[in-house]
């Protein structure tokens, strides 16, 4: 009986961990697609930077910051 209860508990914990991991991945994917409006560029919208162009630093330097979205994400547009 104790073994069965322990097995059910372990399965519940594993399920909760798997579900929270899936939810976190979905939030990260959604965050990368949030559009932000640049001041002076209305009605144009530019996407937040992802991991490649973090803080508006493109590989070729063609991105510039136009607005701060959060403490760790900037709204950028191609210059």
UniProtKB/Swiss-Prot annotation:
Domain of life of the source: Eukaryota
SUPFAM superfamilies named in the record: Defensin-like
InterPro entries tied to this protein: Myo_ane_neurotoxin_sf
Location (main, coarse): secreted
Propeptide: 21-31
Keyword annotations of the record: Cleavage on pair of basic residues, Disulfide bond, Ion channel impairing toxin, Nematocyst, Neurotoxin, Secreted, Signal, Toxin, Voltage-gated sodium channel impairing toxin
Gene3D superfamilies: Anthopleurin-A
Compartments where located: Secreted; Nematocyst
Database matches in Pfam families: Toxin_4
GO CC, alphabetical: extracellular region; nematocyst
GO terms, molecular function: sodium channel regulator activity; toxin activity
Function: In neuromuscular preparation of crustaceans, the toxin increased neurotransmitter release, causing repetitive firing of the axons. May affect sodium channels (Nav).
Protein name according to UniProt: Delta-hormotoxin-Cpt1a
Native source organism of the sequence: Calliactis parasitica (Sea anemone)
